[in-house]
């Protein structure tokens, strides 16, 4: 198997925990703790991403070698790997939670890659489920196959949808059982274990900065800020104050663009705590996430959030801004002034508004989003919610609407209830007439309009029930559906004849099934 070129700047340039013990503890004055992955009994490759493997320089023979499974299950290290778990805190459901840290994620190192054109990349390789760390609290540091499949598939599905995200190299089974109480209801059971190798330029989170501010460690906070800028934002220069202000604006801008993309494809993160917010504006930590089936701005897949629905679909833009405010509060001791932080927060609002308008225009096939279009969108969203209409199928079908004879007929497959469709039909036809009138103002040829809309409205998304079907099969040792689902999600905007079933709306059996309509943080 090919070796990687590793340049582990995080552990070389920032202070680490001098205590080598993996015992759970509060870690002070350090950005990380060195820790070894815990070996497993029978590592075996379940699935892998060809694109991420190629990004790192691995070919298929590398990936299918026993050495590959051993390394990415945590049983062996490649030359130059220096495993560690990061120290961070976070606000969880709006409240400060103190030290959290990588409780079952272990970073192996930073791989440096060079493309044929000379462009270099830096990729942190992180194992999720590789055993206990000083930050594991009361947990075992392991992950179950169920949650690992969901993380692996969604990481790659989001990338191919065009949403900023961490990636996934591979999914490796451990041959061991992990005990989990899926809904914390006193009914634990043993489930198959697995390890996912996550890949990103950086796994630094908002919480990495918050922990040092909460402890009054301004010196280490400053070091981490300047390190992050130097490694992850090398294009920024100038005096420290200027560079830091530009950096915070970049973080706010990237976060805004990410959230707009979530809203475009109907993704609900489910647990937008500040420790789950990437400093690079990447979607990170795929836990109790879900995809909008029937359009509902008030829906959240996370049972832990079922009461307050803090992280519901329609509230995600607001929560991202709130999280950036917590980051701004954490950074204030370094900045020493509120103005550049306020500028970043204001920038988030402006960029999100611009990106959201651009996204809405694209989904509807408009060149630009005018102020008069807001009413059209508000009316549509209210109608989709009341009539229980599938978001993905509706917008995909809208591209094929006959503008000379607009009718609800080609959109009927998007309705979950025939009764609600019948009730909504007059109002829907009225909206379609208004939409047709607005669309004709564009003077865009029908074929061109269809191609443009189909490039932003996916045919395939990782619906919760599809992931659950793959999980059910994998738990019986059948992994073919995981691989097929990955392949489908690699081409979400293509028609893919013969794979229509992967574009079907949620079946009735999945409406209230665990893993399909409701999920927990148990993993």
UniProtKB/Swiss-Prot annotation:
Required co-factors: Mg(2+); Mn(2+)
Positions annotated to bind ATP: 101, 103-104, 128, 140-141, 198, 205, 285
Alphabetical list of Pfam families matching this protein: SelO
Top-level enzyme category: transferase
Catalytic reactions on record: L-seryl-[protein] + ATP = 3-O-(5'-adenylyl)-L-seryl-[protein] + diphosphate; L-threonyl-[protein] + ATP = 3-O-(5'-adenylyl)-L-threonyl-[protein] + diphosphate; L-tyrosyl-[protein] + ATP = O-(5'-adenylyl)-L-tyrosyl-[protein] + diphosphate; L-histidyl-[protein] + UTP = N(tele)-(5'-uridylyl)-L-histidyl-[protein] + diphosphate
EC number: 2.7.7.-, 2.7.7.108
Alphabetical UniProt keywords: ATP-binding, Magnesium, Manganese, Metal-binding, Nucleotide-binding, Nucleotidyltransferase, Transferase
Domain of life: Bacteria
GO MF term set: AMPylase activity; ATP binding; magnesium ion binding
Keyword Nucleotidyltransferase listed: yes
InterPro entries hit by this protein: SelO
Binding positions for Mg(2+) per the UniProt entry: 276, 285
Location of the active site: 275
Similarity comment text for this entry: Belongs to the SELO family.
Biological function: Nucleotidyltransferase involved in the post-translational modification of proteins. It can catalyze the addition of adenosine monophosphate (AMP) or uridine monophosphate (UMP) to a protein, resulting in modifications known as AMPylation and UMPylation.
Name used for this protein in its record: Protein nucleotidyltransferase YdiU
